[in-house]
């Protein structure tokens, strides 16, 4: 997936299921780790960028993402990352920078304010992973806050690329609209009753629906092969993951590659 691109292409899913030899209940992070182990070698040559919510923006998973040669843009909330935000709040210019732009929304221009800082610790400790943090606050012309969110990434951040990084971070919601919503409301009937089968029935039915959606996405594309080939050289990754390998229409960060969102659909 990518900002400005209508398609969201599902990749091979990794289901949250009890694992052989494990006594603990399976979870989203454990499934994401398995997805990386199974699929990392396939997608890392695309220089793909993993998108995810605050669940993923913790040191062990960020390190694992980098070991598999992926980039990442993960949501980073103040309540769950107190060390990072304490560090950011102590920084002053030029180590913490602010950029304000005007974005046309309908008939009006809305102020978009970006704050960012490079090389801040993600956690406590001398061996803490250093990441780059950025935040977007969108307001209406009267100053009312319409949207605010923060992320961490391994991409170095500048005035030139921070708007595109924020657009990429926000693009993960395309999965809710173009993928999940379509599967649940547009004839695929991907619903909670898929969880009532025994053994592998639920996973099989869900996988068949995801595969059907993938084929329909390519068949609906004016040039299905161009969707793939045009992205390979500079293509902005998990559990069922979704991507459209396409150049970002807004900015020069071709190194973002494909954008792949890590998420757990609720069936």
Locate the predicted segments by residue.
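A short, flexible helix-boundary coil/loop motif
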Residues: 100, 113, 184-267
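Conserved, well-structured functional cores that handle cations and Mg-NTP chemistry
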Residues: 1-63, 68-70
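Hydrophobic, well-ordered secondary-structure segments
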Residues: 13-41, 73, 82, 88-102, ...
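Short acidic-glycine loop/turn motifs at beta-strand connectors
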Residues: 1-7, 140-144, 185
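Short, conserved catalytic/metal-binding motifs centered on acidic residues
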Residues: 32, 50-55, 72, 151, ...
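Conserved active-site and cofactor/substrate-binding residues in soluble primary-metabolism enzymes
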Residues: 27, 160, 202, 206
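Short amphipathic alpha-helical "interface-anchor" segments enriched in bulky aromatics
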Residues: 159-194
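An anionic, glycine-rich sequence signature occurring as long contiguous blocks
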Residues: 77-172
């Amino acid at each position: 997936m990518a900002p400005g691109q209508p398609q969201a292409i599902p990749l091979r899913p990794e289901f949250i299921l009890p694992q052989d030899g494990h006594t603990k209940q399976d979870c989203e992070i454990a499934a994401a780790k398995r997805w990386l182990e199974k699929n990392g070698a396939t997608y890392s040559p695309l220089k793909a960028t993993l998108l995810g919510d605050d669940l993923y923006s913790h040191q062990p998973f960020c390190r694992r993402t980098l070991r598999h040669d992926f980039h990442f843009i993960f949501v980073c909330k103040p309540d769950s990352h107190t060390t990072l935000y304490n560090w950011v709040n102590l920084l002053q210019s030029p180590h913490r920078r602010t950029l304000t732009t005007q974005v046309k929304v309908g008939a009006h221009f809305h102020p978009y304010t970006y704050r960012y800082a490079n090389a801040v610790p993600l956690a406590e400790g001398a061996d803490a992973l250093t990441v780059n943090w950025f935040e977007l606050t969108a307001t209406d012309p009267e100053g009312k806050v319409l949207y605010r969110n923060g992320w961490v990434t391994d991409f170095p951040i500048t005035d030139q690329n921070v708007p595109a990084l924020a657009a990429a971070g926000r693009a993960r919601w395309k999965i809710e609209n173009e993928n999940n919503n379509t599967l649940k409301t547009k004839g695929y009937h991907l619903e909670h009753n898929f969880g009532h089968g025994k053994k592998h029935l639920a996973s099989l039915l869900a996988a068949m629906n995801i595969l059907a959606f993938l084929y329909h996405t390519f068949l609906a594309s004016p040039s299905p092969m161009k969707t793939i080939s045009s992205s390979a050289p500079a293509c902005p990754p998990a559990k069922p993951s979704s991507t459209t390998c396409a150049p970002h229409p807004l900015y020069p960060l071709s190194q973002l590659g494909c954008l792949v969102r890590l998420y757990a659909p609720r069936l």
